[in-house]
């Protein structure tokens, strides 16, 4: 009988196996789907709804301040998975600090994978291949932590095969739309034939609470965040005539800006998610973003452009001030952030799902205008995620010709 060592492959055979396991090409975005809840809230009347729902109408001056905050956001409307009648069932959620985590979990644990599944179904339909061909699922959310986790529940709702490789990314915040693309690139390029379904789904009820004069940070968050989900199909070596790749994911980098963990931070408590934001966050991000951009270009041997206007842009719309200051710092023309500002106006800040919406907005408008590429007619672009840490995700994209 042969020994175990004699039956195993030689080192050169192992290298051959390794080479065969890897894809030949770069990971690409092949399909995009989005979904949002049915309840729409216009921003210009949101202060009335919010103060009424939280029994806070007697706080007249605070309401005026909140209304002013809402009107400065450059948000037109947002979507939520609740309305006023729904909130009446949960008085602890609409208080400021009553224990309410159980109620919030009861809403988010089933709601997050359900909303994510809606977006995933649209992405799979656009992709055009059977869902049985999905090999990996990456699910991302900042709410509804549970076991089995949201990736398991989404796979179950979609009816994916039992051997799909699943990953769940919890509690990363607003930069996570970039994080999931970084994960998906590694999975697609290191597993020949892999097709990665990426799902980001967010429900903001985890941080909804009554206004409080001593915690205006939370009120700012409540004026910005909206509910939504985005899904992408990512894979290498697209099948010609079947799959329609739009963007190549050329390089991904994550950077933590030193000594900034107190600038944006959130904490899960019995009262839900508590949100804290420094006034200096837009400046901190804008002062560091160019270094992140230069790093991602140099890491692949490309000289950074002298004029950042030569690129298309997918920045996370963390808020008007962040977009304004990054735009100014990089000396970008106003139209460069058009897609991001459109998504911010139409949906608010949907945390990890936002950049998926912006990719969708950009590719649709590019097609409608008859441009040469999905990236507003340009070949090269950048996707940026900003969030707690402060963490920056920088992704170098190469847009393919419109098909």
Curated annotation (Swiss-Prot):
Modified residues (Cysteine sulfinic acid (-SO2H)): 174
Matches recorded under SUPFAM superfamilies: Thiolase-like
Subunit structure: Homodimer.
Entry keyword Cell membrane: no
Coiled coil: none
Protein name (Swiss-Prot/TrEMBL): 5,7-dihydroxy-2-methylchromone synthase
Site (described: Determines the polyketide chain length and product specificity): 207
Activity vs pH: Optimum pH is 6.0-8.0.
Organism: Aloe arborescens
Recorded metabolic or biological pathway in which this protein acts: Secondary metabolite biosynthesis; flavonoid biosynthesis
Keywords: Acyltransferase, Flavonoid biosynthesis, Oxidation, Transferase
Active site: residue positions: 174
Gene Ontology biological process: flavonoid biosynthetic process; polyketide biosynthetic process
Amino-acid positions noted as binding CoA in the UniProt annotation, renumbered to this chain: 68, 277, 281, 318-321
UniProt similarity note: Belongs to the thiolase-like superfamily. Chalcone/stilbene synthases family.
Cysteine disulfide partners in this protein: none
Catalytic function, reaction form: 5 malonyl-CoA + 4 H(+) = 5,7-dihydroxy-2-methyl-4H-chromen-4-one + 5 CO2 + 5 CoA + H2O
Record Pfam families: Chal_sti_synt_C, Chal_sti_synt_N
GO MF, one annotated term: protein homodimerization activity
Remaining remarks: A.arborescens is a medicinal plant rich in aromatic polyketides, such as pharmaceutically important aloenin (hexaketide), aloesin (heptaketide) and barbaloin (octaketide).
Described purpose of this protein according to its UniProt entry: Catalyzes the iterative condensations of 5 molecules of malonyl-CoA to produce a pentaketide 5,7-dihydroxy-2-methylchromone.
EC category: transferase
EC id: 2.3.1.216
């Amino acid at each position: 009988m042969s020994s175990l060592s004699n039956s195993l492959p030689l080192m050169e055979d192992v290298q051959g196996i390794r080479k065969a396991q890897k894809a030949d090409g770069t990971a690409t975005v092949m399909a995009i789907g989005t979904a949002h809840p049915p309840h729409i809230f216009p921003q210009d009347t949101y202060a009335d709804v919010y103060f009424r729902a939280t029994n806070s109408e007697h706080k007249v001056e605070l309401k005026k301040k909140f209304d002013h905050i809402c009107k400065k956001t450059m948000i037109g409307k947002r979507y939520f998975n609740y309305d006023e009648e729904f909130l009446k069932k949960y008085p602890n959620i609409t208080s400021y600090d009553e224990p309410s985590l159980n109620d919030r979990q009861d809403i988010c644990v089933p709601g997050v994978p359900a909303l994510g599944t809606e977006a995933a179904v649209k992405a799979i339909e656009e992709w055009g291949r059977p869902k049985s061909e999905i090999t990996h699922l990456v699910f991302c959310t900042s709410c509804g932590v549970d076991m089995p986790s949201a990736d398991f529940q989404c796979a179950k709702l979609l009816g994916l095969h039992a051997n799909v490789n699943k990953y769940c990314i919890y509690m990363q915040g607003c930069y996570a739309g970039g994080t999931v693309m970084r994960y998906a690139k590694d999975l697609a390029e290191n597993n020949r034939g892999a097709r990665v379904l990426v799902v980001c789904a967010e429900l903001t009820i985890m941080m909804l609470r009554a206004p409080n004069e001593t915690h205006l940070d939370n009120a700012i968050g409540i004026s910005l965040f909206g509910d939504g989900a985005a899904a992408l199909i990512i894979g290498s070596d697209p099948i010609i005539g079947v799959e329609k790749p739009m963007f190549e994911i050329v390089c991904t980098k994550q950077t933590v800006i030193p000594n900034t963990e107190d600038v944006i931070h959130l904490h899960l408590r019995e009262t839900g998610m508590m949100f804290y934001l420094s006034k200096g966050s837009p400046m901190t991000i804008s002062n560091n973003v160019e270094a992140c951009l230069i790093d991602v270009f140099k890491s692949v041997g490309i000289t950074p452009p002298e004029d950042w206007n030569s690129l298309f842009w997918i920045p996370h719309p963390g808020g008007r001030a962040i977009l304004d200051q990054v735009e100014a710092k990089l000396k970008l023309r106003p139209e460069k952030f058009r897609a991001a500002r459109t998504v911010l106006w139409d949906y608010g800040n949907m945390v990890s799902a936002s950049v998926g919406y912006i990719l969708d907005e950009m590719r649709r408008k590019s097609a409608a205008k008859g441009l040469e590429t999905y990236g507003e007619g340009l070949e090269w672009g950048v996707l940026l995620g900003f969030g707690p840490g402060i963490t920056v995700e920088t992704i170098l994209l190469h847009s393919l010709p419109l098909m």
